[in-house]
A protein has these predicted regions:
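Polysaccharide-binding and catalytic clefts of secreted carbohydrate-active enzymes
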Residues: 1-137, 144-147
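C-terminal soluble interaction/assembly domains
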Residues: 115-116, 147-150, 155-178
Length: 178
């Protein structure tokens, strides 16, 4: 990934590199097996089992090498190291080329404003967007705020204010609209 991105930066007169929210794939429901009893979720509905991302061999090598992180933290660390390397590598090649990310619009569940609920990019895509803003590993940030203002659980103005509050480095904040 890095080789391709830096090759594009070197070879072409580009203004920026933009990546979307696909760090690890969005969860895919596992097929149901006939005759198996299905567990219930917290609402009494059948829980959806998700297929796991097939990174087992890399995970095993990490552990064999003395790695101490749990698997979700290890996945986030992989993404974080890629984001940091992309930002630094792009700016090393051409300081004027901008790097930005458009992550899913809701942040970490443990930091969300009251009343905000829904999908967790932190837990499911292993994307720690708050960390990237904190460290300044991007030039602009485009949170995907694809919900109506009146949709309380994913309130556009509440989420926009949240992301602005997570931006101590003062990076450009360009909210994505659907």
């Amino acid at each position: 990934t890095m080789d391709v991105i830096l090759d594009v930066v070197r070879r072409y007169d580009i203004d920026g590199v933009h990546i979307d929210d696909y760090f690890y794939p969005y969860p895919i429901a596992a097929p149901e097996v006939a005759g198996n009893a299905q567990a219930l979720d917290g609402n009494g509905k059948p829980a959806t089992k998700e297929l796991d991302f097939p990174d087992g061999p890399a995970w095993e090598r990490y552990l064999a090498g003395g790695g101490k992180l749990d698997r979700p933290s290890w996945r986030r660390d992989n993404v974080n190291r890629l984001i940091e390397a992309m930002y630094k590598g792009i700016h090393k090649e051409k300081s004027w080329v901008r790097f930005g990310i458009s992550p899913f619009g809701m942040g970490r569940p443990d930091r969300r404003p009251p009343g905000i609920s829904g999908f967790s990019q932190y837990d499911k895509l292993y994307a720690d967007a708050e960390l990237w803003l904190e460290k300044g590993w991007l030039d602009y940030f485009v949170p995907q705020l694809y919900w109506p203002i009146a949709q309380t659980a994913q309130s556009y103005p509440v989420l926009l204010d949240y992301w602005i509050s997570q931006n101590p480095q003062g990076r450009h904040m360009w909210p994505g609209l659907f």
